[in-house]
């Protein structure tokens, strides 16, 4: 039997080595890829409250003065599931949105969950609305920034009922959550103005509207906002 020369053996060994290394590398790469594929992606909604949980943080009927009753048609929440968020701030905001409940929609941002309701006095028609919206990541802070931009573009707007000008004044507010912003709406044709407050608490944005009292609704709006922010912290602790 003919045996290969030493030179031939050396060449054969040199040829086999790269193949072995390639096979080893290939196996290692496949293993790493498999490990990566098996690693679950992080839930973007982890730690966020659902609409059903946010509902519990809204102020109860006992918070409101005698004569106020919830408006069933305005009480809603997103339930136990999350919705896809979106952001589409308008170049020119619809300033009339400040005149109603869910006024935070003026920012063009929508979160993954929400809860809201509205209490009205049948005797005086005074209105107190409350809402909580939850956002992913740092979006809540951006919502607050977008709100300020929108208000800056809305010095006045025309009231649909009286066809008169509504004056809009916004200002940063301390002592409510991580950041807060107060908007005051006044109109000479109204008996009383409105106070809107937006307060960020972590990933949640609390918004209220009040026409209660003789101070443009300011005292009630601040008291309600503080109540909701405190309740939200408790809900997160229990979640």
What does each model-identified segment do?
Residues 6-7, 20-40:
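Bacterial lipoprotein signal-peptidase II cleavage site
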Residues 33-57:
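Post-signal peptide N-terminal segment of mature Sec-exported envelope proteins
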Residues 208-224:
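A short acidic/glycine-rich loop-to-helix N-cap element
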Residues 1-12:
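Bacterial N-terminal signal peptides that target proteins for export
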Residues 193-204:
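Extended hydrophobic
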Residues 129-131, 203-212:
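Short, well-ordered beta-strand elements
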Residues 68-192, 218, 224, 232, ...:
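A small/polar (G/S/T-enriched), proline-flanked helix-loop surface module common
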Residues 12-17, 21:
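Hydrophobic helical h-region of N-terminal Sec-dependent signal peptides
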């Amino acid at each position: 039997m003919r045996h290969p020369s030493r030179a031939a053996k050396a060449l054969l060994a040199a040829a086999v080595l790269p193949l072995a290394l390639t096979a080893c590398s290939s196996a290692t790469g496949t293993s790493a890829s498999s490990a990566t594929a098996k690693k679950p992606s992080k839930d973007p909604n982890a730690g966020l409250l659902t609409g059903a949980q946010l509902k519990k943080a809204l102020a109860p009927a006992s918070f409101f003065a005698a004569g106020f009753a919830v408006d069933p048609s305005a009480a809603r929440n997103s339930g136990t599931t999350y919705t896809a968020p979106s952001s589409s701030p308008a170049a020119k905001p619809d300033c009339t949105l400040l005149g109603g409940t869910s006024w935070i929609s003026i920012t063009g941002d929508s979160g993954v969950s929400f809860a809201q309701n509205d209490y009205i006095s049948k005797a005086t028609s005074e209105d107190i609305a409350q809402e909580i919206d939850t956002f992913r990541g740092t979006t809540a802070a951006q919502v607050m920034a977008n709100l300020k931009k929108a208000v800056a573009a809305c010095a006045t707007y025309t009231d649909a009922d009286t066809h008169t000008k509504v004056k809009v004044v916004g200002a940063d507010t301390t002592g409510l959550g991580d950041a807060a912003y107060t908007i005051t709406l006044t109109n000479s044709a109204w008996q009383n103005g409105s106070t809107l407050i937006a307060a960020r608490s972590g990933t949640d944005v609390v918004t209220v509207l009040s026409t209660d009292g003789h101070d443009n609704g300011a005292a009630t709006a601040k008291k309600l906002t503080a109540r909701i922010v405190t309740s939200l912290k408790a809900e997160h602790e229990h979640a």
